[in-house]
Curated annotation (Swiss-Prot):
GO terms for molecular function: phosphatidylserine decarboxylase activity. Heterodimer of a large membrane-associated beta subunit and a small pyruvoyl-containing alpha subunit. Coiled coil: none annotated. The keyword Membrane applies. Keywords: Cell membrane, Decarboxylase, Lipid biosynthesis, Lipid metabolism, Lyase, Membrane, Phospholipid biosynthesis, Phospholipid metabolism, Pyruvate, Zymogen. One of its GO terms (cellular component) is plasma membrane. Its cofactor is pyruvate. Catalyzes the formation of phosphatidylethanolamine (PtdEtn) from phosphatidylserine (PtdSer). It is found in: Cell membrane. Its EC number is 4.1.1.65. The modification Pyruvic acid (Ser) is found at residue 254. This is Phosphatidylserine decarboxylase proenzyme. It is a peripheral membrane protein. It comes from Pseudoalteromonas translucida (strain TAC 125).
């Protein structure tokens, strides 16, 4: 058995939810010098660029979770002001992107998966995105872990979808069928200038928590059923966010999937699989 096949076999065999929750408790622990030492080791191992952090000193962070969700310095990620430009919502790397064809998204070469399954199984939630565009962006452990709005939007719905917690690195994307539609995830649907925009925050092994700025921690605890929440898009209780504003965060890296409808915006020609993304830089252009 090759090393890659062994790694995939271990992904299926290990108790991923249990491991992730244990890691989550450890990441939340405030252990003083021990926490600082482990953060320093993490920075060295993953080559984290702390010069961009608002607080570059590892001793500033009382827990791993504070370090994982560290804010950046003011001005570290300028947001493109052009109203016709949709920006990258995260630091990371594009895994796949392109057209949504027959309700399917590309996971990796030779592997497609269902948009309807990704969004929680509701056909009505899926219909607005058929024939549209999608992009999958992977956040590595070294990356900035907050997720921001790629365009102005007003929240209309949030969906929690229970699932597994496979790793979401390129190896598993190439070898685990329906990876993003089988992992635990949080779906946020926004009303925007280009129509509905879906932002799917996908959980993974040792991703201890997925949070949104309006609901706080959505997971853990892990559930066994799909839950959805509808939000008003008008009036004083509407949750409206500007392009570049934070909408959520991962406690450790994972994956974000974006989707929008047909003929609304075109992904820029220089955006390709493996393209490194930086929050605030151009990703797509709204059609005239």
């Amino acid at each position: 058995m090759s090393l890659d096949k062994f790694k995939i076999a271990m992904q299926y065999a290990m108790p991923k939810h249990f491991i992730s929750r244990v890691v989550g408790k450890l990441a939340a622990a405030k252990a003083g010098v021990l926490t600082t030492t482990l953060i320093k080791l993490f920075i060295k191992q993953y080559k984290v660029d702390m010069s961009e952090a608002k607080h570059p000193d590892p001793a500033h962070y009382e827990s791993f979770n504070e370090f994982f969700t560290r804010p950046l310095k003011d001005g570290a990620r300028p947001i493109v002001a052009d109203s016709d430009i949709i920006i990258h919502p995260v630091d990371g790397a594009i895994s796949q992107l392109g057209d949504i064809v027959d309700g399917q998204l590309i996971q990796a070469k030779g592997h497609d998966y269902s948009l309807q399954a990704l969004l929680g199984g509701n056909k009505d939630d899926t219909t607005p995105f058929l024939g549209g565009k999608f992009a999958t962006i992977y956040l590595a452990p070294k990356d900035y872990h907050r997720i921001h709005m790629p365009i102005d939007g007003t929240l209309s719905k949030m969906i929690y979808v229970p699932g597994d917690l496979f790793s979401v690195n390129p190896l598993t994307a190439q070898n685990v069928p329906n990876l993003f539609a089988r992992n635990e995830r949080v779906v946020a649907i926004f009303e925007t200038e280009i129509g509905p925009l879906a932002m799917v925050l996908v959980g993974a092994t040792i991703v201890a928590s997925i949070e949104t700025i309006w609901a706080g921690t959505v997971t853990p605890p892990a559930g066994s059923d799909v839950f959805s929440w509808n939000y008003p898009t008008k009036g004083e209780n509407a949750i409206s966010l500007k392009k570049g504003e934070e909408m959520g965060r991962f406690k450790l890296g994972s994956t974000v999937v974006l989707a929008w409808g047909d003929d609304k915006a075109d992904i820029l020609d220089d955006q390709l699989p493996e393209t490194v993304t930086r929050l605030g830089t151009p990703f797509a252009k709204i059609d005239d």
